[in-house]
From Swiss-Prot:
Polymerization of globular actin (G-actin) leads to a structural filament (F-actin) in the form of a two-stranded helix. Each actin can bind to 4 others. The modification N-acetylcysteine is found at residue 2. It comes from Gallus gallus. Keywords: Acetylation, ATP-binding, Cytoplasm, Cytoskeleton, Hydrolase, Methylation, Muscle protein, Nucleotide-binding, Oxidation. Its EC number is 3.6.4.-. Belongs to the actin family. It is found in: Cytoplasm, Cytoskeleton. It comes from the Eukaryota. The keyword Nucleotide-binding applies. In vertebrates 3 main groups of actin isoforms, alpha, beta and gamma have been identified. The alpha actins are found in muscle tissues and are a major constituent of the contractile apparatus. The beta and gamma actins coexist in most cell types as components of the cytoskeleton and as mediators of internal cell motility. Actins are highly conserved proteins that are involved in various types of cell motility and are ubiquitously expressed in all eukaryotic cells. This is Actin, aortic smooth muscle. GO terms for cellular component: actin cytoskeleton; cell body; cytoplasm; filopodium; lamellipodium.
């Protein structure tokens, strides 16, 4: 550890799929690992193997064949606190190799996170990890900071949940936030399903990770879905092959764009919901008429599920069709948007003006976990 990292703030973005952790002031997270805790499915027979009763992150991923994998964060909200504690412990001690009691820690949360959840996060940080200070920031707001704006509407879509969050002069407008429980994990499940129609069977939690890799490497968003379907039916120009870990090669065609099309047509997976273009529009329409123009001109994409090639052009097309014809519409898709929440956290925690915003251990001891609602908004 170098000297100047004595009390640098830590930034930990806990996503449903990946945990991003690092030091404030850095331009990228030091550690990015899957938010998974794995427990052995079988009885250990070899003595002295040093088998553990649980594995976290990449280690769980590499031993996935013998483990049952569980995600403690579902739809952006922490549901299993014991496992979540393991993930935080892993990020501090194994990944960043720091003592949390020496560093102020910035955590992130989903918009519209239940109040009890924030309190529990605060409690664990101060009581289990003894941090000197902490803060909880809303993910979408951090993404907007990272893009260098204070006004705009963020479409934040990760592994567990998708949100539209309109932000004006740095304040999220809670009445207009839209939440859609459809994100990367659902797309992976849907791809598993449509691949099985092709005769490829993927069932276990370990095989799901293979399908996730296929999705990340080969899927894209069609500009015009019907046209693309016709092209796929009449020629093999859209087909790609993928080699499985055992050497078997599979071919995938229209599944490449049918999978992410679900974002625009949730009925594909039986959801009665508007697509991401409509939720964006609805969110803007819930805002004051005077600020809509600024929101239309600043549509910021954020999160891993916005990484599909073609998604920005498609959003531009769909929102243009919904909005008033004279409106200027701009979709901003920063290349580093996979980590823009973390980057925004890194920027925020290193601002001199932010230093008075931290919740200190002393304030926590005086007021208890509910202090988080007064200090973080």
């Amino acid at each position: 550890m170098c000297e100047e990292e004595d009390s640098t703030a830590l930034v930990c973005d806990n996503g449903s799929g990946l945990c991003k952790a690092g030091f404030a002031g850095d331009d990228a997270p030091r550690a990015v690992f899957p938010s998974i805790v794995g427990r052995p499915r079988h009885q250990g027979v070899m003595v002295g193997m040093g088998q553990k009763d649980s594995y976290v992150g990449d280690e769980a991923q590499s031993k996935r064949g013998i483990l049952t994998l569980k995600y403690p964060i579902e739809h952006g909200i922490i549901t299993n606190w014991d496992d979540m504690e393991k993930i935080w412990h892993h990020s501090f001690y194994n990944e960043l190799r720091v003592a949390p009691e020496e560093h102020p820690t910035l955590l992130t949360e989903a918009p519209l996170n239940p109040k009890a959840n924030r309190e529990k996060m605060t409690q664990i940080m101060f009581e289990t990890f003894n941090v000197p200070a902490m803060y909880v920031a809303i993910q979408a707001v951090l993404s907007l900071y990272a893009s260098g704006r204070t006004t705009g509407i963020v479409l934040d879509s990760g592994d567990g949940v998708t949100h539209n969050v309109p932000i004006y002069e740095g304040y999220a407008l809670p009445h207009a936030i839209m939440r859609l429980d459809l994100a990367g994990r659902d797309l992976t499940d849907y791809l598993m399903k449509i691949l099985s129609e092709r005769g490829y069977s993927f069932v276990t939690t370990a095989e799901r990770e293979i399908v996730r890799d296929i999705k990340e490497k080969l899927c894209y968003v069609a500009l015009d879905f019907e046209n693309e379907m016709a092209t796929a039916a009449s020629s093999s120009s859209l087909e790609k092959s993928y080699e499985l870990p055992d050497g078997q090669v599979i071919t995938i065609g229209n599944e490449r764009f049918r999978c992410p099309e679900t974002l625009f047509q949730p009925s594909f997976i039986g959801m009665e919901s508007a697509g991401i273009h409509e939720t964006t529009y609805n969110s803007i329409m819930k805002c004051d008429i005077d600020i809509r123009k600024d929101l239309y001109a600043n549509n910021v994409l954020s999160g891993g599920t916005t990484m599909y090639p073609g998604i920005a052009d498609r959003m531009q097309k769909e929102i243009t069709a919904l909005a008033p014809s004279t409106m200027k519409i701009k979709i901003i898709a920063p290349p580093e948007r996979k980590y823009s929440v973390w980057i925004g956290g890194s920027i925020l925690a290193s601002l001199s003006t932010f230093q008075q915003m931290w919740i200190s251990k002393q304030e926590y001891d005086e007021a208890g976990p509910s202090i988080v609602h007064r200090k973080c908004f």
